[in-house]
Amino acid sequence: VFRRFLRICAFYGASPTFIFSSATVANPAEISEQLTGLRVTAVTKSGAPKGRKHVVMMNPDASPSRTAILLLKAALHRGLRTIVYAQSRKMTELIAVWAGSKAGAFANRISAYRAGFLPEERREIEAKLSSGELLAVISTSALELGIDVGDLDLCLLIGYPGTIVAMQQRGGRVGRGGQDSAMILIAGEDALDQYFMRNPEELMNRESEAAVVNPFNPYIMEKHLICAASEMPIKTNEPFMAHPAIRRAVSDAERKGLLFRSADGQTFYSNRKRPQREVDLRGTGVRFSIICSETGKHKGDVDGFRAFRETHPGAVYLHNGETYIVENLDLDTRIVRVRAAEVSYYTKVRASKDTEILEIFDEKPVHGTRVCLGRLKVTDQVNGYDIWHIHPSQKISSVELTLPPNIFETEGLWIDIPIEIQREIESQMYHFMGGIHAIEHAAIGIFPLLVMADRNDLGGISTPYHQQTGGAAVFIYDATPGGSGLSREAFHKAEKLLSHTLNVIDTCGCENGCPSCVYSPKCGAGNKPIDKTAATVILNGILKNRAVPFRAKPVLLENRQSQKDAENTEKYYGVLDVETRRSAEEVGGWHHADRMGISCAVLYDSREDRFFEFLQEDIYDLIKHLRRLEMVVGFNIKKFDYQVLGGCYDFDFSSLPTLDILEHVYQHLNYRLSLDSLAKATLETQKSGDGLLALRLWKQRRIREIIEYCTSDVRITRDLFLYGRKNGYLLFTNKAGNTVRLPVNFNQSPP
């Protein structure tokens, strides 16, 4: 958004000054420069008023949530205005419900607050908190920064929030009026919380982390490039086009039909007038509306990724202390239907994941292994969900689901596991898959110690054999489509990541693994299999070995496809067009094309470089000729010409390998173009007539003239095909009146 704004300002000769503010981030100038592309000067002296702040670290025997509720109850009775931070939306709602049930007279003075609430609901909660009508709020990071919530006294953190910056931001919500305040960190069972409980001085003495941003995230950048082009056409010689990532994103957007390149190749136009309406500044994906089926009221929103995990059919959905059951998840309309219900259980999804390496950015040896950084395609499949009783917490049953996979591209790193170590693990009868699974969990858990991140910002996959790496590997990737820069940062600290992971596992006092070391609350496989001992042996084997075993570089599957496409450039092809005896009106509509009859058909043969003519009685000879071809080319051939032919002869024309130029056009533009309009823009020629002319000629039995007309259409279709195959695009005049390029891939094998 900043760069779009600056681009327009530069066009009009304006040079605005930006003022950025941050209370906590360690690299304010750097992050501001990355956001704007401008040089920034940092002013780091703070003049904010401060009272005394007490910091308490608790490692409770009871669950962190239960401990927080007891502390909140005590705080309410003492009149302390309190904010409680939970780590997830669902936990925020659950704690608000549980706390309200135990708060007695204070029940109506407690509220949940999280993203997904409607804007008016959030504003109402903020106003009540500022006025004192609410004494306590249970929130996610939604109340972490950017909102003034009044003079609060006590901050309860249910679990370490992942970064020092986040902890300072949350703790900074209290004592803003200069009064004494307190922040209590209630440790959870996960690795990072327990690490700081064992090393409290490190938590207190750690500096704020440097913020990480990926200004070239292709998912986000693509949307803003389309907006930029609609605001002002993009020129290829603009300064920002010098960056390879931007050039690549523009090229991808052109290929998808989101940007149109001018005929001379120097300017890009947006495919829409107002693409800004479809851009969500708060997320990268689509959003689903949550509607109460009983009242029709809009209860909130959820992003596309969370929709599968939090609002699948049968899920328990919590909203502002109220419980709903999800009745339906409609992927076409992006609407989630829920109904109010009082239940004593909650739901947790079960999922599986797969990954494909698309590109390798970098690689390096780390002790006895190789660590790589690259672009990945992740397939996340929700398979079902488990139903858990709230009190006591125990699984009641499991339900299977049939949902489409969530597929996205992102950035990630992966650690090769040497085959020698795998053989050693298996010879000692340890569970190898359980070992690398444990490493994946522990590494993600300790990840925020090295990079400013939350474990929810990451995903992981461990596999005993990956087809592309040729062996076992542990993948850790950015959970944000396109990548957020976290894996890139961690790649440079790979040695520390491995050593810290080993330290967390080694120093945990449990015997077989626990949430403090190798269990993950996010695991879609229910933390099975897990082998803590195997993980220790694997990591020790890697860190004590300096010789990196040889393994071939991963095979990139897209390269195989490009080689295959290159082989298709010299296919034996024919170009076909058919003229009819009767019009659509005469046979009752276009859907009755099989009743139109054939006045003539013309086929161009690329091997013989000549045109062949066929009448209706020659249809069998035409089919024999078509079957010899490696590819049949036409314009609207699948929905029209083949239908006409099928009405005259019983043959499955869909079995022929066919390239339909109009089909390519529609897939790219989502609307149709005429053969004549493409010929005028691309070839600077035009059709010799139209279909109505051919029908008049048939009624007059002027067959030779029909054949000449049909041959002219075949010649135009052939020349469009050859132009597109050579140049990778056709030309057309868009709705704004600009002659622009339409990308095509006529070298790809037809289905």
Describe every region a protein language model picked out.
Residues E558-M631:
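Conserved RNase H-like, two-metal-ion catalytic cores of nucleic-acid enzymes
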Residues L603-S677:
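Conserved DEDDh/DEDDy metal-dependent 3′-5′ exonuclease domain
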Residues L683-L742:
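Acidic, Mg2+-coordinating catalytic module of metal-dependent nucleases/exonucleases
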Residues C510-C517:
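Short cysteine clusters
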Residues V1-I234, E238-P275, G283-G285, T295:
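Helicase motor core with emphasis on the C-terminal RecA-like subdomain
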Residues S139, I158, N320, T379, ...:
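Short His-Asn-centered micro-motif
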